[in-house]
Amino acid sequence: MAKKAKGNRVQVILECTEHKDSGMPGTSRYITTKNRKNTTERLELKKYNPILKRVTVHKEIK
């Protein structure tokens, strides 16, 4: 799980948005870091989903 950081750089979890809608079991999640000072909004990156076997949009979850 993401741990608390003392500075502006924090760990965030990215979860696939297309996988939830497909109804297939399992989830595709990535852990990355972001700088809260530079990117205040939630991250949205294209990452590879091994279950769907293609690149999909992954959004930051709380």
Swiss-Prot record:
InterPro entries: Ribosomal_bL33, Ribosomal_bL33_sf, Ribosomal_zn-bd
GO terms of molecular function: structural constituent of ribosome
Keyword Transferase: no
Sorted UniProt keywords: Ribonucleoprotein, Ribosomal protein
GO biological process terms on file: translation
GO cellular component: cytoplasm; ribonucleoprotein complex; ribosome
HAMAP family xref list: Ribosomal_bL33 (MF_00294)
Similarity comment text for this entry: Belongs to the bacterial ribosomal protein bL33 family.
Protein's name in the database: Large ribosomal subunit protein bL33
